[in-house]
Regions:
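Active-site Tyr-X1-5-Lys
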Residues: 132-165, 184-195
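Conserved catalytic-site region of short-chain dehydrogenase/reductase
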Residues: 70, 105-120, 136-142, 154, ...
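Short-chain dehydrogenase/reductase
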Residues: 81, 85, 133-145, 175-183, ...
Length: 275
């Protein structure tokens, strides 16, 4: 891979995509291509086909997705399933048909069974049932993983899937209706402090365990995948260390300086016990 290779990063303005862009720029890659959603609707197959024909990228990195936390996944299952399948299918199939030989697909640890043994291993994929609160997103992502595997198997192309653990970083989503747990907690404790609210109520029991990874650190794995011909079709990306949601909440509360109490709404779902 030469530094002048044309690399298209789908979702380049998001938390993950922008981290990858920064990582590649810092390594001297000078021919990066990105499009905003207003410039290129990735759900539109013809638009994606036309884009590939015009730009002719040598490598595609798919960091584009419709994402959200438990609440958003629960409320909009059809959108999370169909929009993600449209986005990734158009990108993967379009890249293959356009002659792209290297494709890096970014997924999520939610593709693994709800009660998969720990630590999560790639071989656990499709061995048991998924967590119901995000199965629609997970099914879409599994489809992307298997599409890349199929192209790899049938056409011997370097189509690889990277499954990061729970990510946080710059340009994260802090909308309480659609965000993931860490940014949601940051906002709740911050607003409680500035509004002088003594208590913060959080979802679930606080007992589930989560592993977290800074998006810019995850981006280094994408650079590695770009610069090396990896022998397998699927790789997990993480730190190997996790914390309980309760520990996360207490850490965020301490850092922000909120002095009140934390209450847990056990009627709300916990999600996967550990991932």
């Amino acid at each position: 891979m030469v530094k002048s290779s044309k690399i298209y990063i789908a979702g380049h303005l998001g938390m993950v995509g922008s981290a990858i862009w920064r990582a590649l720029e810092s390594k001297g890659y000078s021919n990066l291509v990105g499009r905003t959603s207003s410039e290129l609707d990735l759900r539109n197959q013809q638009a994606v086909t036309n884009f590939y024909k015009k730009e002719q990228p040598e490598v595609v990195i798919d960091a584009a997705a419709k994402v959200g936390g438990i609440l958003a996944n629960n409320n909009f299952p059809y959108q999370f399933l169909m929009e993600n399948m449209l986005i990734q299918n158009n990108l993967i199939d379009g890249a293959h048909k356009a002659g792209v030989d290297k494709f890096i697909f970014l997924g999520s640890s939610c593709i693994y069974p709800k009660f998969a043994p720990q630590p999560l291993k790639e071989e656990y994929l499709l061995t048991d049932s998924l967590e119901p609160t995000n199965e629609w997103y997970a099914i879409a992502k599994i489809t992307g993983v298997k599409a890349c595997q199929a192209i790899r198997k049938q056409y011997n192309k370097e189509y690889v899937s990277l499954m990061p653990t729970n990510l946080y970083g710059y340009f994260d989503n802090f909308d309480l209706q659609s965000s993931h747990v860490l940014p949601a907690m940051l906002r709740k404790f911050h607003e409680a402090k500035i509004n002088k609210h003594s208590d913060v109520t959080l979802w679930g029991s606080g007992t589930p365990m989560r592993e977290f990874l800074f998006a810019d650190d995850m981006a280094e794995s994408v650079v590695y995948a770009l610069e090396n011909n990896l022998p397998e079709f699927l790789y997990n990306i993480g730190t190997g260390k996790d914390v309980t949601i309760k520990e996360l909440a207490e850490t965020i509360q301490k850092v922000i300086g909120h002095k009140g109490q934390i209450f847990w709404d056990a009627e709300k779902p916990d999600g996967t016990p550990r991932k």
